[in-house]
Amino acid sequence: MNYLVMISFALLLMTGVESVRDAYIAKPHNCVYECARNEYCNDLCTKNGAKSGYCQWVGKYGNGCWCIELPDNVPIRVPGKCHR
């Protein structure tokens, strides 16, 4: 029984688990993509693997692109300064 659990766990680790999150997509140096139109953000987000995106008006970081179900390998805005 223990072998079955260990083999199942090993298979899970080998296949990898792709997770997603909702967040502001980030430029290099932890800056958000500024926006005025939802279409711009939706295109940007979907090109980076998200389900969709929209322009978050007057949000925490100003007018920035918010992505829905963005893959983990795409950088997101994290707390701290934007270093332009």
Swiss-Prot record:
The lineage of its organism: Eukaryota, Metazoa, Ecdysozoa, Arthropoda, Chelicerata. Keywords: Cardiotoxin, Disulfide bond, Ion channel impairing toxin, Neurotoxin, Secreted, Signal, Toxin, Voltage-gated sodium channel impairing toxin. Changing H83D: 43.9-fold decrease in toxicity to mice, and 96-fold decrease in the binding affinity for insect sodium channels. Expressed by the venom gland. This is Alpha-like toxin BmK M1. Residues 84 form a propeptide. It is found in: Secreted. Exists in two forms, due to cis-trans isomerization at 28-Pro-His-29. Negative results: has insignificant effect on Nav1.2/SCN2A. It comes from Olivierus martensii (Manchurian scorpion).
